[in-house]
Amino acid sequence: MNDARSITRRRFMTLTGSGLAMLGGGHAFAQGQPRLRIDPTEFQPVPIAITNFLPGSPSDGDVGNGVTQVITNNLKRSGLFAPIDQAAFIERISNIDVAPQFQNWKTINAQALVTGRMTRQPDGRLKAEFRLWDVVSGQQLAGQQYFTSPEYWRRIAHIISDQIYERMTGEKGYFDSRVVFVDETGPKERRVKRLAMMDQDGANVRYLTRGSDLVLTPRFSPNSQEITYMEFGQGDPKVYLFNIETGQREIVGNFPGMTFAPRFSPDGQRVIMSLQQGGNSNLFVMDLRSRSTTRLTDTPAIDTSPSYSPDGTRICFESDRGGRSQIYVMAAGGGAAQRISFSKDDTNATYSTPVWSPRGDYIAFTRQGGGQFSIGVMKPDGSGERLLTSGFHNEGPTFSPNGRVLMFFRDPGGSGGPSLYSVDISGRNELKVPTPGFASDPAWSPLLSSTAGQ
């Protein structure tokens, strides 16, 4: 297993000042000033020109090209941007400190332009600079610089991608984030499942467990420094906490019977999970500081897959208390639960694996009915149900940090195995997420740059 200390977030990079530093000579735009507007539900991607990041010296050329490629791929995969082929460029940028000739970029129908530079500093660090231009108005929308160790150049590319996304859409991006998932290798009857973690675009895969025991349902803590998951080892399955920085793990409550479907509270102080007792399962929450446990449901049914609302006041969960698996919502401290899943076109449909959006506006779910497994979203009151994608076996949705994209896994059956896919909440731009092998049970981390002080 890789040295977990080498992947801790706090060592990734150093930003100038107390946060994101504006470049000298750049223009800082006030929140209310004009900027490009992109409706995330709009079907026409915005044409954007992304020039190669200039090298500060000949030895910086490869990393500059790498940063350019990562930014291009991020924006293209979002579905909101259409990067223009560099072969169409009329102007070749040679100095990012000089305003471009905007007519050259209008001619190739670019609405936005990204320029940048990568320079190795005397102390060995990399300095990354970028500019974002509104080609139509001729305004500079953003200009910032970052310093980082050379090995973390990809992270800089993701952060720049987020800055471009936010400046053009008015919403936070999601590129500077990770995904934890279950990596699957070997024949189906002897499948080895390991806990794995990667960047949201599939790069930098790291294996966190050796595969000697079966692992399921990994979930990030709010500060992205811990993962909770279920493991089938000696005896009953147990819920574990894994510390990414130290590589250490511990059992979350040594309960008799099986514990499963763990998830952190939004403040990271508690873990909610399902505990099997006889033929039924109920929801429990454990305070991670005091290790005290509170029972939230007490029914003869199977209550599982709990997920907190972003403000921590409510939970959604899956229960078969009405005879079929459906989604319910109740107060985080327990009490009466309200069913919110009611299929209008298939009264026999079942709902499972609910998860609350970080924005609080939707609950994503898996719906089974008519021989199909669908990934969908609905509002927390059950209204506005929308199926985004359907197939033989789609399951386990997880939201991006900005709540605009879902990742899930699809298993085609047969002798093969599952793969990860993403789709936006309007149901378009479905993409396969690259992984080394078969993969299931994805969970998206919060935006790493937003958790730097936690």
Swiss-Prot record:
Family affiliation: Belongs to the TolB family.
Keywords associated with the record: Cell cycle, Cell division, Periplasm, Signal
Job description of the protein: Part of the Tol-Pal system, which plays a role in outer membrane invagination during cell division and is important for maintaining outer membrane integrity.
Subunit note: The Tol-Pal system is composed of five core proteins: the inner membrane proteins TolA, TolQ and TolR, the periplasmic protein TolB and the outer membrane protein Pal. They form a network linking the inner and outer membranes and the peptidoglycan layer.
Keyword hit for Transcription regulation: no
Protein name from the UniProt record: Tol-Pal system protein TolB
Biological process according to GO: cell division; protein import
UniProt signal peptide: 1-30
Organism of origin: Bradyrhizobium diazoefficiens (strain JCM 10833 / BCRC 13528 / IAM 13628 / NBRC 14792 / USDA 110)
Subcellular location: Periplasm
Alphabetical list of Pfam families matching this protein: PD40 (PF07676), TolB_N (PF04052)
Any GO CC annotation of this UniProt entry: periplasmic space
Superkingdom field: Bacteria
